[in-house]
């Protein structure tokens, strides 16, 4: 049975029987910690527990912590420290925005495995692209601080500065990426550049977009996860 706990203010759920190894699962935007149940079904039989945390402002979480990196990353660092005290071996399994946040939270650390699906890897580039589409200059954003744009999002000068100052790197020699060929969020060139720089394994899923959610896509994801751990 999953065990529901809190780590600081972060709600979390732990899957699997006691073990010496554990993955941290970090969901993406509009996701939730219970998404880790599918991943746990893959790795629990292989001797890994899975600890999944709820990102701020998700799944009814209303505790004052905001989904901005200067609040979410320190929270994940607290979770990281919690895990280091309890497990000998750690892995990271993260999705989309969760991947960007997790890579920052584990910067300077080394984990046994790092499995990233549809990862956001260059937030500065993504924000600048959104600014260009909305016709907003860096100078205007700097002066105004925050500017709402179509689609319900808000561009933030502080967020842009953070992204510029906190580029992500590798946290494991065993880093594997799963990328949908129709991903509308992250250009293939960004994925390829990261994989070349850090010698990562890349699996490209034909027909898939950024969000892997169809049954056949989830089956493909589970297969990919199992393959990485069996290498």
Per-region residue spans from a language model:
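Active-site glycine-rich loops that stabilize anionic/oxyanionic intermediates
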Residues: 20, 28-31, 181
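N-terminal cap/lid segment of alpha/beta-hydrolase-fold proteins
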Residues: 1-17
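Short beta-strand immediately N-terminal to the catalytic nucleophile in serine-hydrolase-like folds
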Residues: 92-94, 117
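Conserved alpha/beta-hydrolase
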Residues: 40-62
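The serine-hydrolase catalytic nucleophile loop
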Residues: 29-41, 189
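Catalytic nucleophile-loop/oxyanion-hole region of alpha/beta-hydrolase
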Residues: 58-84
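The alpha/beta-hydrolase serine catalytic core
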Residues: 4, 109-193, 197-204, 208-231
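Gly/Ala-rich beta-loop-alpha elbow adjacent to hydrolase catalytic centers
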Residues: 94-102
């Amino acid at each position: 049975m999953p065990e529901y706990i809190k780590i600081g203010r972060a709600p979390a759920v732990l899957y699997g029987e006691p073990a010496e190894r554990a993955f941290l699962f970090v969901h993406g935007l509009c996701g939730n910690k219970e998404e880790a149940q599918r991943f746990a079904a893959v790795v629990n039989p292989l001797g890994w527990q899975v600890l999944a945390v709820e990102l701020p402002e998700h799944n009814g979480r209303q505790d004052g912590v905001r989904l901005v990196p200067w609040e979410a990353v320190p929270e994940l660092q607290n979770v990281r420290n919690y895990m280091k005290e309890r497990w000998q071996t750690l892995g990271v399994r993260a999705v989309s925005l969760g991947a960007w946040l997790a890579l920052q939270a584990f910067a300077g650390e080394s984990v046994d495995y790092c499995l990233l699906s549809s990862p956001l890897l260059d937030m500065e580039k993504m924000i600048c692209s959104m600014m260009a589409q909305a016709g907003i200059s860096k100078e205007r954003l700097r002066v105004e601080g925050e500017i709402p744009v179509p689609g319900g999002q808000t561009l933030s000068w502080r967020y842009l500065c953070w992204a510029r100052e906190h580029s992500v790197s590798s946290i494991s020699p065993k880093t594997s990426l799963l990328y949908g060929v129709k991903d509308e969020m992250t250009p293939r060139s960004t994925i390829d550049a990261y994989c070349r720089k850090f010698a990562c394994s890349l699996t490209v899923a034909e027909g898939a977009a950024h969000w892997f959610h169809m049954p056949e896509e989830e089956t493909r994801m589970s297969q990919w996860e199992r393959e990485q751990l069996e290498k």
